[in-house]
Amino acid sequence: MKRVIFHIDVNSAFLSWSAVKLLTEGGPDIRLVPSAVSGDPSDRRSIITAASIPAKKLGIKTAIPVSMALRKCPNLVIVHSDWEWYRHCSTSFIDICRLYSPVLQQFSIDECFIDMTFRLYRKDAAEVARALKDEIKEKLGFTVNVGVGSNKLLAKMASDFEKPDKVHTLWQDEVQEKMWPLPAGDLLWVGKKTRERLSAYGIYTIGDIARLPENSLARIVGKKFAAQMHDNANGIDNEPIITEFQEAKSISVERTFAKDIVNPEELDREMFKVACTVAHRLRRQGFRCTCVSMFIKFTDFSVAQKQCQISGPTDVTALILNEARRMLGEMWDGTAPIRQVGIGLSKFTKEETEQLMLFEDPKLSFYREWDRKYDEQKSRSEDVKFLAYERKSPGEPQG
């Protein structure tokens, strides 16, 4: 039987949820005008955490300072973020999705997957998806997109098609027509640097990736990432829905600063310490991870977070730190004061696939030896003097 997976994604979640609250209080619908959410609208150094569609058309993006947003749009309506209310909206939205299928995986505060394979009762999948979308809108007052596909990848890709308040399908036999013409950077797990590297080799679309021989792709992005990328570009994804009762354990470490940090080098040193600690805990439990998440809290208590899947299981501090740095660069403009940072690891395995990678990157043996020395010191005392990685190495702390 063909799998049927829904991916449900709230449209401009924080902005939509703030709009619903204002409407219940008799206010205007800020979704219809240039508007944004910020931790502290009165502080021009505060960061934009969400923007309405009219605001996005004016160039208002998340993670830019309020001062910059106001220069782009002097009449921008800015509202204060309300995390307690957001959690309430998230729970309500998930509860409705769970009524359609108990096999649910919450992917973030504003999106989830549900397995509808045995829940359609001979109904059309897109028809059921529209019913779910409309029920959320009617009962909760905000809109979602629902992507429908035969696996998680296709469902998520489909939900990112035209927004808002839409249902889109992306079945395996629709991949060439609907997915292949999209830019390579739209493919799940393809970030900015990978996109730029692909572009340098004349690979511009998802179809270009799909048609490229896997061994040729491996020479560009590395053997392990190439296999996953090639499968994804062809719509192949066998990952199951992981319910909250099945989820693997995660490890995270946060660090709150006595004084807000604005200096990039100082922040990098603190991230280095966090990465060392969280990677040490991972190794101590005998696991490797395939997912890294990065969390930052600004001085106005607004929060930004990202997660990424890495090309192969690892417990190496340098590789984990590299991913955290990359995600930080996507969330922080380098000037907004930061109060707290955190790094999380999840999707654990005991695979030792890095043994093959040692022959591809000689530095890995150096990083492993560094980690061994760190773990040895840590076993003797919690007070570890942080060693510096070799200069020019990917794991090198910047100060």
Residue ranges and their predicted role:
Residues 186, 194-338, 350-353:
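DNA-contacting surface of Y-family translesion DNA polymerases
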